[in-house]
Amino acid sequence: MIPVTELRYFADTQPAYRILKPWWDVFTDYISIVMLMIAVFGGTLQVTQDKMICLPCKWVTKDSCNDSFRGWAAPGPEPTYPNSTILPTPDTGPTGIKYDLDRHQYNYVDAVCYENRLHWFAKYFPYLVLLHTLIFLACSNFWFKFPRTSSKLEHFVSILLKCFDSPWTTRALSETVVEESDPKPAFSKMNGSMDKKSSTVSEDVEATVPMLQRTKSRIEQGIVDRSETGVLDKKEGEQAKALFEKVKKFRTHVEEGDIVYRLYMRQTIIKVIKFILIICYTVYYVHNIKFDVDCTVDIESLTGYRTYRCAHPLATLFKILASFYISLVIFYGLICMYTLWWMLRRSLKKYSFESIREESSYSDIPDVKNDFAFMLHLIDQYDPLYSKRFAVFLSEVSENKLRQLNLNNEWTLDKLRQRLTKNAQDKLELHLFMLSGIPDTVFDLVELEVLKLELIPDVTIPPSIAQLTGLKELWLYHTAAKIEAPALAFLRENLRALHIKFTDIKEIPLWIYSLKTLEELHLTGNLSAENNRYIVIDGLRELKRLKVLRLKSNLSKLPQVVTDVGVHLQKLSINNEGTKLIVLNSLKKMANLTELELIRCDLERIPHSIFSLHNLQEIDLKDNNLKTIEEIISFQHLHRLTCLKLWYNHIAYIPIQIGNLTNLERLYLNRNKIEKIPTQLFYCRKLRYLDLSHNNLTFLPADIGLLQNLQNLAITANRIETLPPELFQCRKLRALHLGNNVLQSLPSRVGELTNLTQIELRGNRLECLPVELGECPLLKRSGLVVEEDLFNTLPPEVKERLWRADKEQA
């Protein structure tokens, strides 16, 4: 006989799956165990006990056995004796019924009558119970075995248990308690449109966060050790981070379908149908389980009798078991019907964390759907605490807190100080690249002046940025930064320069337009779409103190808002990435402009609107499509113009009107196709910087000597063969770039350039260097750019002096 304890194997599932079993599944499993016991008990009795006990019947009335042999004396027809050839003779004394059958004949009669005359329900009752119970068990546990559902269930249970036991769950919730116990008001994060949402502080921590009711500790007494609740070690942090990733991937995968829900529904429907079927036929056939059974079989030739009276020894017990079984099936069926009603009444393919959002500080926990929602509903039937603790790993706020903790552990103050550098403006700069957020230790660098954030998604600027009293410049490269209200208040008063680079319009935080004291704004990104231009550019009207505006994009025309802002702009720079920029007449309104840059705007002529900007001091038309600059004559009206950059164009000649720009100090004409320099150029007596490199020049006019203020001359990459002696009358020359020409010799008068600190000679046809180079007192070896073998043609004392000058500087 099978031990009762072994029957649990048929009903038990994996222990981990127990949390997916609601109370009704637990009840039905135990009912199934009892049904199995009934089946095994009944089957065991049938195997071990006599199935049927039969005796021949000597007194037969109408093919039925008379219950008493005295019936033959009763009035009426005389009984027949079909089962015997021996006629009874009256006996005056007591007598018994004797049969002349041996044991084998009795066994044979028992077997034949059991097989042919006992009702099938009484015969197979234990096996029917076993069959139906196994079907019930299969229906109840099929979803745990079916590959398409078992994989999801196994993965879900594994993640759920890890989330429940994770140290981050307890510590994150403990931080919630601390935050809600803090009397200081909480500031809500501002979104792109700077909507402010007030946040309230709860007084009853335990009531606000019921998730912690089972884990009461020192927090319950108002004592919180921040080192325990706020810091995770590296291993715990990595484990929690991995859990967040697993939950995200699992949610994406499971929410795609509802196969678990549909399979569970079908299992329940099958069990209800099975219940109805069992009740119908069992109640109908249970009365066929009888103790007395008349058996009429045609075996008279073997035993001498045809009619027998048989007893079914197990009938009474089977009837009791059948009644008990029917009651169990009814109870089982009612539970199944309740399950079906529960599934049909409730929307189980949607799960809302509304109550948890209200109870905790994690108001961003999303609702879930399909199989994910259904499994959470089942978990709630087991213990709602599981879903409440699991919700922590669905919250982006919680993930950001964990990310911040891990970030703080990785980026210590010493490590950040090692990353500090000095930029070109001699400002102390920190560049953070591809991090998950801003380490809190950054705000301990009180000496920081420039903060660069690049490729940092979903970063939030906290109020602690107010500690950076020296911060004046902020870079946001592909970083959609949010900001808290106190931080915005600080930046509004202190930030002077802002650089933003984006590929998607969503990467531009709209709170930047509330920076009332902002003086310099750099925007780099695609503004080709009309709506993008409106959203991004239109907010510039709010920046009343803006002085410098740089746009690197692909505009087809100058937006009106730029013109409106231009009333107080001092510098406007547009790098149009090669897209043709038209309709520049609105530039006339920017009367206060001192610097104008129109770079890569595909300009073919110098825009006439520029000539109305009388305050211009610097014009940069780099990398356009300029072929002629006849309009340069109009520059004479720009009396303050000191710098003109016409580099990287296709200019073939310089108009003689260039001489009218008498205030010009810097002129960039490099990377063009100029073949000749007009004498009028040298009327610009104030020129200090002249760049004519990478052109087609073959000589320098002797009038170059008129530029007595010239400090830097670049004629690199031309075809110049000789240098005019007048060049060396420019005694203020500090840098002379002569590389990649066809110079045969360097005049000895080079020694007259007493201010020379750098001379480039590489790439010429020089055979030797003049000794007079040693007469340039400020020239060092590092400032002499020449081939090594050519340098070795100098006398040893000259070389020694140049080397010594380098060492003294070092």
Swiss-Prot record:
Heterohexamer; oligomerizes with other LRRC8 proteins (LRRC8B, LRRC8C, LRRC8D and/or LRRC8E) to form a heterohexamer. Can form homohexamers in vitro, but these have lower conductance than heterohexamers. In vivo, the subunit composition may depend primarily on expression levels, and heterooligomeric channels containing various proportions of the different LRRC8 proteins may coexist. Interact with GRB2. Interacts with NOX4; this interaction prevents the ubiquitin-mediated degradation of LRRC8A. LRR repeats lie at residues 399-422, 423-445, 447-468, 469-492, 493-515, 518-542, 543-565, 567-589, 590-613, 615-637, 639-661, 662-684, 686-707, 708-730, 732-753, 754-776, 778-801. Belongs to the LRRC8 family. It is linked to Agammaglobulinemia 5, autosomal dominant: A primary immunodeficiency characterized by profoundly low or absent serum antibodies and low or absent circulating B-cells due to an early block of B-cell development. Affected individuals develop severe infections in the first years of life. GO terms for molecular function: cyclic-GMP-AMP transmembrane transporter activity; identical protein binding; volume-sensitive anion channel activity. The lineage of its organism: Eukaryota, Metazoa, Chordata, Craniata, Vertebrata. Changing N66A: Abolishes N-glycosylation. N-glycosylated. PANTHER family: PTHR48051, RAS SUPPRESSOR PROTEIN 1. It is found in: Cell membrane; Lysosome membrane. GO terms for biological process: aspartate transmembrane transport; cell volume homeostasis; chloride transmembrane transport; cyclic-GMP-AMP transmembrane import across plasma membrane; intracellular glucose homeostasis; intracellular signal transduction; monoatomic anion transmembrane transport; monoatomic anion transport. The record marks R103 as: Required for anion selectivity. GO terms for cellular component: cell surface; cytoplasm; lysosomal membrane; membrane; monoatomic ion channel complex; plasma membrane. It catalyses: chloride(in) = chloride(out); iodide(out) = iodide(in); taurine(out) = taurine(in); L-aspartate(out) = L-aspartate(in). Residues 1-23, 143-264, 342-810 are cytoplasmic. The chain crosses the membrane at residues 24-47, 124-142, 265-286, 317-341. This is Volume-regulated anion channel subunit LRRC8A.
